[in-house]
Each structure stands twice: as structure tokens, then as C-alpha cells.
Amino acid sequence: MRTGPGWLLAAAALPFFACAQEATIDKVHDTPAVRGSIIANMLQEHDNPFTLYPYESNYLLYTYTSDLNKKAIESYNWSDNANKDEVKFQLSLAFPLWRGILGDNSLLGASYTQRSWWQLSNTGESAPFRETNYEPQLFLGFATDYSVGDWTLRDAEFGYNHQSNGRSDPTSRSWNRLYSRLMAQNGNWLVEVKPWYVIGDTSDNKNITKYMGYYQLKIGYQLGEAVLSAKGQYNWNTGYGGAELGVSYPITKHVRFYTQVYSGYGESLIDYDFNQTRVGMGVMLNDLF
């Protein structure tokens, strides 16, 4: 597999973060969490040892897609009757395993993200789950405040990612990656880049990088109380990729109205090589900020 310069730069920077980050921030876990920083939030101390932290967004949407990938699920006895409307939801949580592993502003953490596409309206087929993706991670994270111009690097994360759909052949899909995640802020802007390097067996989906590329880019902007977001992945050599746009607005203190549009390849593992456009509306518990 090929690896881009972003991954090489991030890997080379790991010793620098381990040695230097302690001098740049005065005990992040003794101060309020930095807005939008996953790592700074996880460094906050709580009395309850079982406290879980949000990692990616947590949401529930009613969605409709332009096209359904029935060919990929033709081994299911209900595939011909699958509906284009689905409930899509994401659960994403993290837990700090060891705060201060490489200095006050570092941690060893684990996260678990699950995305599901549920045929809730398909009562004639007992409302099956068409696809669920399971994504555990183990990572080293650093909260930083290094600045270049008006931009401040807030999170630096280096870890291992496994993603699979938990199915047996012929619908089994999975891959393993080493990754880095760098997040920077400038006022109401947030930019995050997550390059990866694929490792291990990809026989279930040998050409997955053709459609999913070698990185994910995420951009967020806070406009008043609303949050506008965009993220996507793209392979510059093949011209394939996918993008997700989102808008959220608070309904209550802890619940936000959320609209999402996904277009392109790779919305789920079963659809990694399938092009579609999906529109959804629902609620969200946490956004980028």
C-alpha cells in the first residue's frame, strides 16, 4: 500500500509531541476542556471511573437514498424487497485508559464507533439491519497549543483502527489501519486531517483504497448557534471518493436538530464501491464544537 506525506510527517512528529508538549500547556486536565478538542475533553478528571466521553458525533436520522446497493446484499433472502428509506444512527464513545502516559497533556485512549443502517419501515421483512459497521480504536493522544499564524494545533492522535461489518462471506467487509489525526482551530473554524496506512488482510475488499483513499479531511464552522460541517475522503489517483455535509442547530441544551447529506462512494463498508446520494434529518447529541 502507498502512504502519503501527511502520514510520514505525522509519524515523524510523534517523538516531538511526547517530549515537548508538556511545556506548552499547563495541565490541560486541570482547566476547562478546549472547545472542539476530543483529547482535551478526555483529559478532564471525573469522580466516576466509568465516565465515557464522546468521540465522533452521536446522532439518529431518518434517511432516503437515491439508489440502494442490492447487488452487494443479494445473498440476503430479503434483498429484492429492501427499501430506500432507512434509519441511520451513529454511536461513538471514548475512554481514557492512562492519562499522563507521556506527560500531563497526553493519554492512552480507546474509542468505539458504530454506524447502522436500519430498514425500520420494512415491516414485511421484519425490519432488518441492512448494514452495521463496528470501529474500535486504540490511540495515543496529545492536547497541544502550538500556533502557526492564526491557527492552533489542538489535537494530535496516533493509533490503530479496525473497521468491519461483522458479516460472514460473501458480505464480509473489513480493514485495519494505522492512522494519525491532527486537528487545528482558528476562531470559529476547525480543520482535521486523518491520514492512514492500511495493514493486514484486505481480501474481503481488495480495492477499498481505490474508493476510500488514504485520508479523511474534516472542516467545521460555528455560525452563531449552528454548526456547519463537511468531511470526506478522496483518492487523487483514481478520482473516487465521497463527501458528507451536515448542519446542526440546538433544540435543547443537550439535543440538536441535524441534517446530513452524503454523496459518493464509501458511506458504509458494504457500499465502499457503490455511488449514491443519501439525505437525512433527525437529532444529534454532540457536534464538532
UniProtKB/Swiss-Prot annotation:
Cofactor detail note: Binds 1 Ca(2+) ion per monomer. In the dimeric form the Ca(2+) is bound by different amino acids with binding of each Ca(2+) shared with ligands coming from each monomer. The Ca(2+) ion may have a role in catalysis.
Keywords: Calcium, Cell outer membrane, Hydrolase, Lipid degradation, Lipid metabolism, Membrane, Metal-binding, Signal, Transmembrane, Transmembrane beta strand
Reactions this protein catalyses: a 1,2-diacyl-sn-glycero-3-phosphocholine + H2O = a 2-acyl-sn-glycero-3-phosphocholine + a fatty acid + H(+); a 1,2-diacyl-sn-glycero-3-phosphocholine + H2O = a 1-acyl-sn-glycero-3-phosphocholine + a fatty acid + H(+)
GO BP, one annotated term: lipid catabolic process
GO molecular function: calcium ion binding; phospholipase A1 activity; phospholipase A2 activity
Coiled coil: none
Xref: Gene3D superfamilies: Phospholipase A1
Positions bound to Ca(2+) 1: S126
EC nos: 3.1.1.32, 3.1.1.4
Signal sequence annotation: 1-20
Annotated positions binding Ca(2+) 3: D204
GO cellular component terms given for this protein: cell outer membrane
One Pfam family, short name: PLA1
Topology of this chain in the membrane: Multi-pass membrane protein
Functional description taken from the UniProt entry: Hydrolysis of phosphatidylcholine with phospholipase A2 (EC 3.1.1.4) and phospholipase A1 (EC 3.1.1.32) activities.
Protein name: Phospholipase A1
Encoding gene per record: pldA
